[in-house]
Every structure is written in structure tokens, then in C-alpha cells.
Amino acid sequence: MQKSLITKWLCISCIMVIATIVIGGITRLTGSGLSIVEWRPVTGILPPFSFESWQSEFAKYKAFPEYNSVNYGITLSQFKFIYLLEFIHRLLGRITALIYIVPLIYFYFKDVIKNRDMLPYIIALLLFCIQGFIGWYMVKSGLLNSPYVSHFRLAFHLIIAVIIYHILFYQLIKNRCDILLILSQTDFKLPLIFSGIAITVVYVQIFLGALVAGLDAGLIYNSFPLMDDRFIPMEIKDNFFDLKNWYDPVFIQFIHRLVGYSVFLVVVVLIICLLKIEHPKLNKIAYFLMIVLFMQVSTGIITLLYSVPIIIASIHQLFAIILLSIIIWCYFLIKSS
């Protein structure tokens, strides 16, 4: 009964974290992230209701660079749209944190989760607590002289969310899944290595994806597989190792493509390793990986070719999390055996 309760709690928490990540991506893609220019952790749980309240929020927004440089002349109705998207993202983050923290306290004091098992839950708790500060730290970077948030802070904000999800999902499968029943002579060395490498490169790719979004790097070089008939674009060919390139959307898009190829190759090798073991569970994971990898690559290419359509770009981000989840599941099963 207690195990089932923890499973349901972790499952809901994981779904909420994914939803918050996806809504956060949509908020960025629609340029809504700077519409709320204050951070009120407690009083900010309610949106404006009256016409006067909306006018007040709109007036605050007009005092910052994004209105004057990007959205000058937008109507109150247009402002309400971007405001409510950012509001929903923040509210979802608060609700997700509460859904995680309140039951965790209950489980701890009821000794449902033993002290020896508490460390990952505490780490996730600390990350939840600082994630709001990181989000505001990111937003503040776009409220100064430039109407754009720091792409590094944006990527950091996303990666913290992914780490939270990783911890919760790992605890979920640890609590829910049975280990593999395989003869001891089965060699797990290669699939274990490649599942670990796959997790690493997917993390790197998610981070780079956030940099692409932060610099609007998906709006240039909308061709595939080459960039303006070249593998390495002219802008970065002669100064490839210059650190300033990390502020250049051309370079960021190129690196995102490059790591994308790496993700594809590593996951394909992992799939081959899993199929060679000939175990039903691992074969099922291999088939899932084939489908999700295909969807991830396809949505990424479509996102690029069509200059970042919001729905496809959001699906692309979602499949990155699904791909990571399946690889984590694979890693757990192999390691537990």
C-alpha cells in the first residue's frame, strides 16, 4: 500500500515537472517570459482580475526594454496573452513544488520513506527550492539594458528542471520496476557504458537546445543537412575555437546539430547492444528507443526547416525528455542486474 502511494506521488510529480518544462518552452517560444516584471512568490499566485489591475501590470511592463524594443504598441489584449502564459508557467512551477514537498514531509514523518533512502529526495527538494530563484535570476537578465534573457541562464534553468525530473523518475522506476532476471554470464558492460554515454549526450543536447532557443538560433540557416551548402558555416570557419562563439547563434546552431548527430549514433549503438542481449524487457526498450529517436530527429529537422513552429518545437522538446526517460529506464535495468 505504501509502495503504491509513493509510486502514484512520484508519477504525478514527474508528469507535473514535464508539463512545467513544456509550458516553459512555449513561454520562451512565444516571447512571453518577460511579461511579468516582478517576482512575488506568495502574492503572485493570483492573476490580475480587474481592468485597473491589468492596466497597472501593463504600465509596469511598459517601463522595461522589451516593450520599447520588441513589443512597442501592443494592445492590452495582446499583453494579457503573453502575461497569462508566463503566469501559468510560474503557477505550474509552484503547484509542482507543493505536490512534491507536502507529501514528502508526510512520508518522512510517517516513516514511509526510510532515512537511508532520503538523500535523492532531499536533493530534489533543494533543487525545487532554488529553481524559483534561478528562474527569476534568468528573467532579471532581460529586464536591464537588453530585452533578451541570458541564454546561459535560460539553459541553466532548464537543466535544473531536467535534473529534478531525472531524480524523481529514477526513484519512480526504482520503486516500481522489477529488476531483470538474466543469467549471470550475460555481459552488460557495453550497454551499461553506452546508456551512460547516451544520458550524458542527451543532457548536453538539451542544454544546447536551450541556448538555441535563447539566441533564436533556430531562425537562421533553415536548411538540412547542410548550412547554406556547407557543413561548417563561413561565419565560424576561421575562428571556431573562439569563446565568443558561444554568444553567436550560428555557432550554437552548428554545435546543436553536431551533438544531435552524436546522440543519434550513440543511441543507435545502444539499441544494437540491447537487441543482442535478446531479453524481452531490453528488446522492448530498444523498440521504444527506435520510435522516440525517430520522432526526436524528425521534429528537430521540421522545427529547423519551418523556422521554429511553436507546436512542433514544443513536441521536439517533449521527445527529448521522453528519450532521456527511456535511456534512464534502460540504465536502471542494466545496472540493477
Curated annotation (Swiss-Prot):
Compartments reported by the entry: Cell membrane
Topological relation to the membrane, as annotated: Multi-pass membrane protein
Protein's pathway: Porphyrin-containing compound metabolism; heme A biosynthesis; heme A from heme O: step 1/1
GO cellular component entries: plasma membrane
TM annotation in the entry: 6-26, 87-107, 119-139, 154-174, 192-212, 258-278, 285-305, 308-328
Reaction(s) catalysed by this chain's protein: Fe(II)-heme o + 2 A + H2O = Fe(II)-heme a + 2 AH2
EC class: oxidoreductase
Physiological role: Catalyzes the conversion of heme O to heme A by two successive hydroxylations of the methyl group at C8. The first hydroxylation forms heme I, the second hydroxylation results in an unstable dihydroxymethyl group, which spontaneously dehydrates, resulting in the formyl group of heme A.
Name listed for the protein in its UniProt record: Heme A synthase
Taxonomic source organism: Rickettsia africae (strain ESF-5)
Lineage, opening ranks: Bacteria, Pseudomonadati, Pseudomonadota, Alphaproteobacteria, Rickettsiales
Gene name as annotated: ctaA
